[in-house]
From Swiss-Prot:
Stretches the record annotates as Disordered: 1-41, 355-403
Predominant location: cytoplasm
Entry protein name: Antigenic heat-stable 120 kDa protein
Keywords tagged on the record: Cytoplasm
Species: Rickettsia conorii (strain ATCC VR-613 / Malish 7)
Basic and acidic residues bias locations: 19-34
Gene designation: sca4
Transmembrane regions listed in the UniProt entry: none
Start-end of Polar residues biased regions: 355-380, 387-403
Taxonomic placement: Bacteria, Pseudomonadati, Pseudomonadota, Alphaproteobacteria, Rickettsiales
Length: 1022
């Protein structure tokens, strides 16, 4: 090569860096012909060789990468060695390969396709005899692949390769007279170790370029299998420390190292193949590694950087003097120097991998081979690694079974060993060829598996490759829309099932895949949603909650940031998937709440979507509340230290908390149904269960109307009965509990609507008709018994409605008293009168007659009023309405009492509002006192450690959660305690005493304190 870079093959020898006269050229050509006509003795060993010049040189093995055009066209080739490689090796191989392809096409059943390909070959051959376009087209790989399966063709290609190497090395060797040509390496043993050798390489001027070091490795024998299934043991190989950077002297250097046989010896020259490194003079004059060439398919003995390279050639195994780590270093340097690797193994690995699944890996005692993906920037120089199946044990001869490995997986892994782009090319070619969508999906899935199983790739590279595969699937024009969905979902499923990728890294893959899908212009919204939902499913299937949260958060953010319009963003789909997942309610509540919050903030959820998601959230919260509530109920029911009365009180408190909660009436009904169902299904005695159920019914019936309307009470009561009816206990027990529920309603003075709700609960329960009829009879019997009790206590009931001052007998008594009071002055006046107008008897008779007449009218009026009050058509308030007013007043008084913080204020309240205020009926005041006494007793129980306090709840539902006892940290339960309830025990006793004293005073009140009638012994004398 001249200094100005101009090339002239007819006048310039790049190796000798000199020009020849015409006479010298003719003499040299004659010497070459004579040399080529000589035969080489097969017994002669092949030698390592090197050539040192200041000119560029390229040597190559026959390769499919060369067939694909990696070597520049003839018009651009000036290097005589490269030209010789092309003419003696590559082109003859191409000719033989095309000949076999045409034979295969002649036998192809699809005649149209066969004719199309035949014409394509013939037409291109007229333009370019190298057929670079044909061999470079991925769509033609299936034909190349099939041709290479022919054993006769393989033998021809191998013989061409061996003869070509022999020819090139002999033609351009120093021994043949070629100036500055190849010459054997003179290795010198290291003085301190027999397994180390070295040689110094110098340029034409005698300046040292580098020192090569060779190490002979004697290892414990390991076994590998050839393609035909036979086994070979390797016990010795060598490593050469090929230089990466050369900066000692100027010039070019080409190292060609012979591959060793399995026993560590050199093959004969007629079977030799070589690993060659080409160092070309760089801009600064120093040699730069620009190209390497190696025999066909190159494999490595393991996954570590110290794994030795090997090939199978001519049915024999050969080891090369380069390790995996050194090979990668050299490839990176080639890329850095913008060189070109003419590497048969890379391209042929891909082609052979497509059609020959029987390609077997090398197996070592300590490690297995595996696919390897180099960083993308080195993708054109990535060494091919054939994947492995099961490793052999040390010193064990075991033949790998090809049927144990998925052939397609070998194909994808082999393609991936070249580069990610090679894998995508292979996949796309397969997608184009495959008509069956199932085969297309299988191919995509196998590619994803190969990526994730590649042990040489770090996690970042795996992520990048998975994303590239997903993007390739979305954008592939040969896939139908539904197939794209299935293909991407197959990639997602592969991510899900991969056992080696950490969960947090999986979540990143999901996030990136969703971003590709949502931002794609090649998908419809329906298809995008299907892929999005699959990604969410995979994210929710991750093994730990942190990874699941990371996955959903990442997907959520991608959805919000996607290029879709706000109304088209599919965040609701994420929420729906979370809602129907099998996660715990607590985790679903957390995830769904996060999605809803973010969606509202980003304004990507419509009002209807927000409402729907909020409903889902409420339902999840209700489910969790139900679960927690049932646990508390079970703890109470199975507490051996509490009696039925205490169990009832505690479950009443739980029931009250449910009724006071923020959930809808329907949800409250579901929880109450679960409570009664749990009670009914417990192992308690039937009478005890009925007593507890009665307490539940009473709590519902007496609950404040301000937080629970009458229709909602009825709905919840129906649910309570449904829980009883659908329990798995026997029918007599259910009948008894139904009676208990009805008794609780009457005890709580519930109206007819509440009682009727019990029948509704029976009707809506999932039991047979005979059981429904039996439960209704039990309900009716309980109602009749309660009505009988009410009839017997009717008078007491009237007292409770504040009508005692208006009873007829009281009015008659008062009017009689008025008569006496009116008559006495008349009598006294008559006695003093000296001139009486009429006699006293007449006057008394007249007055008495008038008074009695008035009394009669008043009695009739009172009786009529009494009848009107009892009449269903009367205009007066009904008994139920007056009861409700009384209950409401009691609640108001109790609430007002609760606002008093000190004992003195509470005592003053009792005197002012309960003892002195006679405008309130006795019944209201007494009920208020009873309710306040109940609260004081609860407060006492809380303060007194000797009193059972587990699961006590204040009806108000506004308490703070505090531990039961600091002395018992093992107790997990908690109690709800209102701050004011934690009073001093002495003050508590004072209040209870004041309440009981007030109760006695109210109960002893006279119905009327008017003066008794003054009785005379005889009428006055006239």
């Amino acid at each position: 090569m001249s200094k100005d870079g101009n090339l002239d093959t007819s006048e310039f020898d790049p190796l000798a860096n000199k020009e020849y006269t015409e006479e010298q050229k003719q003499t040299l050509e004659q010497e070459q012909k004579e040399f080529l006509s000589q035969t080489t003795t097969p017994a002669l060993e092949a030698d390592d060789g090197f050539i040192v010049t200041s000119a560029s040189f390229a040597q190559s093995t026959p390769s499919m990468s060369a067939l694909s055009g990696n070597i520049s066209p003839d018009s651009q080739t000036s290097d005589p060695i490269t030209k010789a490689v092309r003419e003696t090796i590559i082109q003859p191989q191409k000719d033989n390969l095309i000949e076999q392809i045409l034979k295969d096409l002649a036998a192809l059943t699809d005649r149209d396709l066969a004719e199309q390909k035949r014409k394509e070959i013939e037409e291109e051959k007229e333009k370019d005899k190298t057929l670079s376009t044909f061999f470079g087209n991925p769509a033609n790989r299936e034909f190349i692949d099939k041709a290479l399966e022919n054993p006769e063709l393989k033998k021809k290609l191998e013989s061409i390769e061996i003869a070509g190497y022999k020819n090139v090395h002999n033609t351009f060797s120093a021994a043949s007279g070629y100036p500055g040509g190849f010459k054997p390496v003179q290795w010198e043993n290291h003085v301190s170790a027999n397994d180390l050798r070295a040689t110094v390489v110098k340029n034409d001027a005698g300046d040292e370029l580098c020192t090569l070091n060779e190490t002979t490795v004697k290892t414990k024998p390991f076994t590998l299998a050839k393609q035909d299934g036979t086994q070979v043991q390797i016990s010795s190989y060598r490593e050469i420390d090929f230089p990466i950077k050369l900066d000692k002297a100027d010039g070019s250097m080409h190292l060609s190292m012979v591959a060793l046989k399995a026993d560590g010896t050199k093959p004969s020259k007629d079977k030799a193949v070589y690993f060659t490194a080409h160092y070309e003079e760089g801009p600064n004059g120093k040699p730069q590694l620009k190209e390497i060439s190696s025999p066909k398919p190159l494999k490595f003995a393991g996954t570590g950087d110290d794994a030795i390279a090997y090939i199978e050639h001519g049915g024999e195994i050969y080891t090369l003097a380069v390790t995996r780590g050194k090979y990668k270093e050299m490839m990176k340097e080639v890329e850095l120097n913008q060189g070109q690797s003419v590497d048969l193994s890379q391209a042929e690995d891909i082609i052979i991998g497509q059609g020959q699944s029987k390609e077997q890996p090398l197996i070592t005692p300590q490690q297995t081979t595996s696919s390897s993906v180099e960083p993308p920037q080195y993708k054109q120089q990535v060494p091919p690694i054939t994947p492995t199946n099961q490793p052999l044990q040390p010193e064990t001869s075991q033949m790998p079974q090809s049927q144990q490995v998925n052939p397609n997986l070998l194909n994808t892994a082999t393609a991936l060993s070249g580069s990610m782009q090679d894998l995508l090319n292979y996949v796309n070619a397969g997608l184009t060829k495959a008509i069956d969508s199932n085969k297309q999906i299988d191919l995509i899935k196998e590619a994803a598996t190969a990526i994730l199983n590649n042990e040489k790739s770090d996690i970042a590279e795996k992520q990048a490759n998975i994303i590239a595969l997903a993007e390739n699937t979305v954008n592939n024009k040969n896939l139908k829309p539904d197939a794209k969905v299935t293909g991407v979902n197959a990639v997602l499923e592969t991510i899900k099932n991969d056992q080696n990728t950490p969960n947090l890294e999986k979540s990143k893959m999901l996030e990136a895949t969703v971003a590709i899908v949502l931002n794609s212009e090649n998908l419809e919204p329906k298809q995008k949603q299907q892929m999005l939902e699959k990604a969410v499913d995979v994210g929710l299937s991750l093994k730990d909650d942190a990874s699941r949260a990371a996955a959903i958060d990442g997907i959520k953010d991608v959805v919000i940031k996607s290029n879709l319009s706000p109304e088209d963003k599919m965040l609701i789909a994420v929420g729906d998937k979370v809602n129907v997942s099998e996660l715990s309610n607590a985790e679903k509540q957390k995830l769904l709440g996060s999605v809803l919050k973010k969606g509202v903030e980003a304004q990507v959820l419509s009002p209807a979507q927000q409402q729907l998601m909020q409903q889902h959230l409420y339902k999840i919260m209700a489910e969790q509340t139900k679960k927690d509530t049932i646990k508390k109920v079970n703890d109470i029911l199975f507490d051996p230290l509490s009696n039925t009365e205490l169990k009832t009180t505690n479950i009443q408190a739980i029931t009250s908390n449910v009724l006071d909660g923020p959930a809808t009436a329907e949800v409250k009904g579901e929880i109450i149904q679960a409570i009664t169902n749990t009670i009914a299904g417990s192992s308690l005695e039937a009478q005890d269960k009925a007593a507890i159920i009665k307490g539940v019914g009473e709590t519902i019936a007496t609950h404040s109307d301000t937080s629970l309307s009458l229709p909602n009470k009825a709905l919840i009561m129906a649910s309570a009965e449904k829980g009883i009816a659908e329990s798995q206990t026997n029918l007599p027990d259910r009948e008894l509990m139904t009676k208990g529920l009805v008794d609780g309603i009457y005890e709580g003075k519930g109206g007819p609507e509440i009682t009727k709700a019990v029948s509704s609960g029976i009707d809506n329960s999932n039991i047979n008709d005979s059981e429904k009829e039996a439960l209704k009879k039990a309900k009716d019997a309980a109602s009749e018994a309660a009505l009988d009790r009410d009839t017997q206590n009717l008078t007491e009931g009237f007292k409770g409605q504040n009508i005692e001052e208006h009873k007829p007998h009281d009015d008659i008594y008062n009017k009689a008293r008025e008569v006496i009071n009116a008559v006495n002055p008349v009598i006294e006046a008559l006695e003093k009168s000296k001139e009486p107008v009429v006699s006293a008897e007449e006057r008394i008779v007249q007055e008495t007659s008038s008074i009695l007449n008035n009394i009669s009218k008043l009695a009739v009026e009172k009786v009529n009023n009494f009848r009107a009050m009892l009449s269903p058509n009367g205009n007066l308030k009904t008994l139920e309405e007056k009861k409700e007013e009384a209950i409401k007043k009691v609640d108001e008084l109790v609430k007002a009492f609760g606002t008093k913080s000190s004992t003195e204020e509470q005592q003053s309240f009792i005197k002012t509002n309960l003892i002195d205020d006679k405008t309130l009926s006795k019944e209201v005041r007494l009920q208020t006192i009873d309710k306040l006494l109940q609260e004081q007793k609860r407060s006492e129980a809380i303060e007194n450690p000797s009193v059972k306090t587990e699961d006590v709840r204040v009806v108000s539902g506004k308490s703070k959660l505090k531990p039961i006892s600091k002395d018992n940290p093992d107790i997990e339960k908690a109690k709800m305690v209102v701050g004011r309830d934690r009073v001093n025990i002495k003050g508590n006793i004072k209040i209870m005493g004041a309440l009981m004293n007030a109760r006695d005073i109210i109960q002893s009140e006279n119905l009327n304190k008017s003066t008794p009638i003054k009785r005379e012994s005889s009428p006055p004398q006239r």
